[in-house]
Amino acid sequence: MASKKKERGPPPHSRSWQALTPPLSEWILDAVAAMGFTRMTPVQASTIPLFMGHKDVVVEAVTGSGKTMAFLIPVVEKLLRLEAPIKKHHVGAIIVSPTRELAEQIYKVLLSLLAFHAPSAAAIQPSTSDETADGETTLPSYPSSTLKVVPQLLLGGATTPAQDLSTFLKRSPNLFVSTPGRLLELLSSPHVHCPQTSFEVLVLDEADRLLDLGFKDDLQKTLARLPKQRRTGLFSATVSDAVDQIIRVGLRNPVKIAVKVKGAPGTEEKRTPASLQMTYLLTRPSHKIPAIRQILNSIDNTPQKTILYFSTCAAVDYWSHVLPSLLPEIFVTLPLHGKHPPNVRQKNFSRFTNSVSPSVLLTTDVAARGLDIPLVDLVIQFDPPTDPKAYLHRCGRAGRAGRRGLSVILLCPGREEDYIPFLEVRKTPVSLLESPPVALSDTLATEATSKIRETVLRDRALHDKAQKAFVSWVRSYTKHQSSSIFRITDIDWEEAGRAWGLLKLPKMPELQKFSGDRTLGVTLDWDKYSYKDKQREKHRQESLNSATTHNPLKRPAPSSSSNNDTAPWSKTLEKKSDKEKRRERKRAKKEREHWEKMTEEEKTKSRETHQMLEELRKKNRQELNAKSHTSSSVLSKPQEAELDGESEFEGFD
């Protein structure tokens, strides 16, 4: 018995790549060694054998734990261990990602892995690199019977569906890495085939977000086009929050793999990497910018990459214009949000990931999930996320692959402090920020507000952005899932306005009962406040002159009574007549619309009521006429005038 045990090789708990059963291909072992992965992470050691062994898997693991390689290796191995190559224009595997950036990241990791498989590298090379001017030879070609993996990246916005289909028909890839929308468009083509004989495996990365409302419909339609006899893997940091939805996806007896991080002895397990320090800082809204500046300045080693999270796209737009003057000069600021055109998103994301100088990425939750951005040392959350699940993913951009990281969330003193015990209940312990120390004062806050306003006063367009951003921030605040903690009634509007450097508070329903200073202490000649853009300023001036010329309220006048005295009486009468006609038309239209919406029973009752009213009016008129005959002719008209109102309905209850 002892000899048999020795023949089995390393114990099952070993995380050596050579210890896997079934064993990995030699070229994959070479690839992971060249990439610097000396041994598997816990999630890889648990997932790869099961996924390669024909099991559906639901994997819940902390962010930054190596989930990408945990599904890429089994997918590639499955496609390369088939009995025969996948037919032309047939798809063997699909990897679905919720965001463009994450899909691109997965695709790049896949290419770096396939570079070690010669047939696949030769098939991929013509589309990813061109021959040099000297006519250097490319990799050797292989017979069509050779098994290889040819991936295609599908992203909405970067190319059109027609271009993607053309690439598919030309190269005949057998593996898609895609976002949900573009994948569905391509699968809808009659030229793209996913039959049971060819299709092997489906991977849903960041599965809980893929099942959110925004992706649910596309995902269901996609699944309807795929064979049920397939292997499916769902990977996320918070799978447990979407279990009910995952069941409906159609996994067949899945194995659930949950990889947690153990804290110190006696403490509960955590859902974040041990190398990541998650902290909070209590600060008034107007102190947030000075706090961010101090953290960036006083942290031990200057963070190479920092991610600053805001709640809305409009907020990112606004702060990307005003923050550069507030942060230390060595930091480069870059905006990234979901409403950017695809080329802008790609450009800014690449600039941030490839930056050699300290950089700050201003973003929304579009950059909160799955992205493996190297050298992220610091994450600051200017606004808490509306969805508590996003908190964990935001923090997880730092402290990846064993690198030390710091996450700081800025909360206002008071009810928002309850967010900390709320996170602890969700197994996400957060401690008070002690290092680096942050010393705040009203003087620093006032200086920050003044600097923001100086920047905004240079261009009226920034004021417009500020108003839009503030309104969008308020809207997002009202939509917090933790509504008992984040309450709109607790906002100090003047304090919040100063924190954003507003020149005045915007007009919005939430401020209807606000009785404070809407100008925030700012005195400004709004007519002279101009746009930097000459065309916009020209248009504004024209609108201003037009309003002054045609709107009597804009013209200086001694009093409203004098204007009324000089206006012709006939025109006043005409205006009144026109006004009455408009009212009558509106009333008739409302009655007509109301009548069309009524049921037949309601219409019958309405007719009966109308008939009763007419009879009563007729009766009252007859009585009125009878009285008028007995009265003097002098009093008859005034009496009619008195009785043409309520008296018409006298006796009707």
From Swiss-Prot:
Basic and acidic residues biased stretches: 572-581, 590-626
Reactions catalysed: ATP + H2O = ADP + phosphate + H(+)
CDD domains: DEADc_DDX55 (cd17960), SF2_C_DEAD (cd18787)
GO CC, any one term: nucleolus
Domain (Helicase ATP-binding) ranges: 48-257
Binding-site positions, ATP: 61-68
Bias type Acidic residues, positions: 641-653
Positions of short motif DEAD box: 205-208
Assembly description: Component of pre-60S ribosomal complexes.
Domain notes: The Q motif is unique to and characteristic of the DEAD box family of RNA helicases and controls ATP binding and hydrolysis.
Described purpose of this protein according to its UniProt entry: ATP-binding RNA helicase involved in the biogenesis of 60S ribosomal subunits. Binds 90S pre-ribosomal particles and dissociates from pre-60S ribosomal particles after processing of 27SB pre-rRNA. Required for the normal formation of 18S rRNA through the processing of pre-rRNAs at sites A0, A1 and A2, and the normal formation of 25S and 5.8S rRNAs through the processing of pre-rRNAs at sites C1 and C2.
Protein name: ATP-dependent rRNA helicase SPB4
Organism of this sequence: Coccidioides immitis (strain RS) (Valley fever fungus)
Lineage: Eukaryota, Fungi, Dikarya, Ascomycota, Pezizomycotina
